[in-house]
Amino acid sequence: MASPARKWPSREGFTADVLTNWVQRLLLDPWKLVPILALAQYTVKGREIIESRPHLLKAIKTLTTLAVLQRLSAWLDRRSINNAVSDHYIWNKEVIVLTGGSGGIGRRIAQLLGDRDIKVAILDISPPDPSNPLPHTVRFHKCDITSPTAIADAAAQIRTTFGRPTILINNAGLLTGRTILGTTPQETRAMFEVNSLAHYWLAQEFLPDMVSNNHGMVVTVASQAGYAVTPNMVDYSATKAAAIAFHEGLAAELVTRYHAPRVRTVLVTQSFTRTTLIDRLTPEDSFMNPLLWPETVAEALVKQVLKGESGHVMVPGSSGYVAERLRGYPLWFQHSIRCQLERLMRAGN
């Protein structure tokens, strides 16, 4: 399905994320609120306005406090997950390994990175569509990422043609959209091998060079389904929960076990996206949980990668906020949400 041109306010239209961004910019920007508060308290005109509207000063103080605390929390988050150390990326010298880059979100990621003349090695079982060629810095390597031997062979080719990879993007994924009883052992096993276990095999191949140089990045493309288990895709949810655990554990091991604090880790948790993975399903497309275009997810991921920093890319933030915190809610609420999710993923057995 062809993506629409990027439009205002977003490809997905007017969504909760768009509204939230507007509120952030208009009402929770400390660079705007602090001067307004100063004018209200320390200028003659400001005091005159406040005296006639006493509740206005209280509102400004409340918003300013919230805005400052929010920025402080974000700064602490950023400092913590980057281990309080900086790093520098020279993009024409970096080498990116991208799994599942022949189609869907991965194809868009390869395009965006290639457009910047960044070297990208795609690992996939099928080549990209030749009718829409990728930039010259993007190369395809046929590889079964569930096989450590195949990964090692592809890695040798990449090191010969591109050099040693510095960034690994674990993007490949499988989804059958079937119930627990309706899925075959082969389907479930394949899903875990691609969505979860391959992350370990790929890290074991490419991470040692990053650790030895104390430079690099591992991007884990998971899913909001990893937070909110959904009927008709329980196995998929389990694989993505495992991918999230891989990301979190790797981030801690890089500091405590490998002493490589500059190796970055990025987690991507997206909602339903218009790719072939959901062809059999009936995902929601609403204000709170819009059906995403692959370009939207790819752009958010690439933006974070180009920062050269660890981070969490959550798209959309509205549904992700609820999903990420679901297990902290009362059991009755958790169960009702999971049961409601069934109608979004109704696709046969």
Predicted segments with their positions:
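Conserved NAD(P)H cofactor-binding loop of Rossmann-fold oxidoreductase domains
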Residues: 171-178
